[in-house]
């Protein structure tokens, strides 16, 4: 019988550079005084994202595990999630009252999804700099994630992207699922993300 709490596992996916690690940094810093949090990061050959979070002092180093997936990072969150499941288990044993473990996927494309064995909730991050066409390209990250984050809205004028078009396309691609427009560097939209995590994750409001 396990002697530790089963934490809520939240998968965070999205293309390289969309803001996944930035999202985790700000979420950890905002939530860590209220909830017991840990993070698993995935990189193909390094533990770069784990180092970034540690150096940013988002969490104590013993609350972050970097998984080196090798090969295809999609496999490590979907078809064979064993390394990630083991990392979540290790963190839950190390910190027996964990409320949340965030699992950040390696940089992936729009078709990557998390195994339901690994993630109870999924958040997918795209960014305005990729162009306003990204939402209408679809893919499971856009259409099936529990929350879609459209980040870097401050860059819209510089890349010729219309936020109105992006919102219209997003609403059409995921008519019943929530989405948030954010500028994580400035904290814009962060309150809505936290509200989603607390409500959908059924965390005790504190």
Curated annotation (Swiss-Prot):
InterPro entries: CobW/HypB/UreG_nucleotide-bd, P-loop_NTPase, UreG. One of its GO terms (molecular function) is GTPase activity. CDD domains: UreG. GTP binds at residues 14-21. It is found in: Cytoplasm. One of its GO terms (cellular component) is cytoplasm. Keywords: Chaperone, Cytoplasm, GTP-binding, Nickel insertion, Nucleotide-binding. GO terms for biological process: urea catabolic process. Its main location: cytoplasm. Homodimer. UreD, UreF and UreG form a complex that acts as a GTP-hydrolysis-dependent molecular chaperone, activating the urease apoprotein by helping to assemble the nickel containing metallocenter of UreC. The UreE protein probably delivers the nickel. Facilitates the functional incorporation of the urease nickel metallocenter. This process requires GTP hydrolysis, probably effectuated by UreG. Belongs to the SIMIBI class G3E GTPase family. UreG subfamily. This is Urease accessory protein UreG. It comes from Aliivibrio fischeri (strain ATCC 700601 / ES114). The lineage of its organism: Bacteria, Pseudomonadati, Pseudomonadota, Gammaproteobacteria, Vibrionales. The gene is ureG.
């Amino acid at each position: 019988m396990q002697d530790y709490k089963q934490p809520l596992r939240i998968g965070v996916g999205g293309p390289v550079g969309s803001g996944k690690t930035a999202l985790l940094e700000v979420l950890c810093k905002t939530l860590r005084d209220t909830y017991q949090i840990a993070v698993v990061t995935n990189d193909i050959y390094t533990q770069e994202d784990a180092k970034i979070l540690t150096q940013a002092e988002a969490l104590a180093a013993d609350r972050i595990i970097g998984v080196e997936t090798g090969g295809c990072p999609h496999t490590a969150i979907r078809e064979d999630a064993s390394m990630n499941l083991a990392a979540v288990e290790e963190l839950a044993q190390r910190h027996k009252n964990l409320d949340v473990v965030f699992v950040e996927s390696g940089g992936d494309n729009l078709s990557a999804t998390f195994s339901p064995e690994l993630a109870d909730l999924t958040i997918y991050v795209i960014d305005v700099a990729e162009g306003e066409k990204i939402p209408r390209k679809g893919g499971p990250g856009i259409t099936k994630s529990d929350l879609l984050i459209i980040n870097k809205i401050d860059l819209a004028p510089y890349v010729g992207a219309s936020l109105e078009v992006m919102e219209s396309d997003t609403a059409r691609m995921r008519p019943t699922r929530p989405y948030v427009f954010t500028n994580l560097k400035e904290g814009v939209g962060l309150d809505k993300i936290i509200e989603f995590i607390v409500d959908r994750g059924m965390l005790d409001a504190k």
